[in-house]
Every structure is written in C-alpha cells, then in structure tokens.
Amino acid sequence: EMATLDCGTCNFGGDEIFINTDNTIANFGDIMQERGIKPECEVFDKGMIDLALKAAKKGHIQYPIHFDFVLGVQMTATVRDLVIMATSIPADSTWTATGIGKNAWGIAAATIAMGGHVRVGFEDNVYMSKGVLAKSNGEMVERVVQMAKLLNREVATPAEAREILGLA
C-alpha cells in the first residue's frame, strides 16, 4: 500500500552515489499510481522536496504527499535543518523524520515536539545509546512512545496511523 520513492540523487559518501533523475522519479510515481501505492517521498535535503513537488505538479505524485525527512546523511541533523524541511512542504502533507545513527533520538524528540511523526528501525539506527545495541525494532518504537507521552503527544493506533497516512 505504501513504498519509498527517493526524490533525488543521494551521495552516501566515498564513491557511493544513488542516482535518481527527474524522469526516474516521474516513472516510479506513475507506476505507484497505476498500482494504487502511496509514495513515501524520502528526501535527504531541501532540494529533494522541491523535486517531489515538481513531480506532483506534473501529476506524477498525488496530493496530499507524505514525506520522510532523512537527516544525518546528505544534510546535517539539527533541529534547524528539521524546521527548514518541515516548513518547506504543503500544509496538507504528512511527514515523518528519521535521524540516521547517532542522530536518531534527538531528531525523534524534535519531530514529536514539532507535531511530526517518527520513523525508527534497524534500517536507520541500531543503537539505543552510545555502544548499546537495540534488542529489536520494538524496543526503539517503545522509546518513541515514551518520548511522545513525555511531550503530551497521543500515540496513534494502527488504524489511526493508516488514516493519518491516507491509507484508510
């Protein structure tokens, strides 16, 4: 029902570059629409937001758009960076944020405080704290639930999450 659509080229460091042209984004967006799949527009910097919006204006991505801001790879992972990303998307968009590695928990807390949603898991981080490996994805989810409660945010049920994401 939902799949990642990387909305631009990403330099992962060293010689590793993931190339995603405007045409590639458009083609994948069209295929997703044909198959009834909602894109999670994964963006690693502000320019990728602009490319996603460009594809949406041309009809390759349907509104409302769901974004996942991935911070700590191509762009630094500061609260300022998160604010720039969150204020650069249409008001009817939904968004999650992910801090890679050591950035995971600070970005999670800032995201919750800003009204966004959090993505956690072994794809992005394996540590609960410096040198302490997470036992499971569930342990990471539980930490985010605790953060949300401390910040007076309600945690969505699976049905509510589907509705928020436009999958209901």
Describe the function of each predicted region.
Residues M2-E123, A134-E139:
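Catalytic alpha/beta core domains of metabolic enzymes, predominantly
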Residues I17, S129-R153:
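C-terminal helical cap(s) of enzyme catalytic domains, especially alpha/beta-barrels
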Residues I49-D50, M128-S129, L165-G166:
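Short secondary-structure boundary/hinge segments and terminal tails
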Residues Q146-A168:
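Mid-to-C-terminal alpha-helical segments outside catalytic/metal-binding sites
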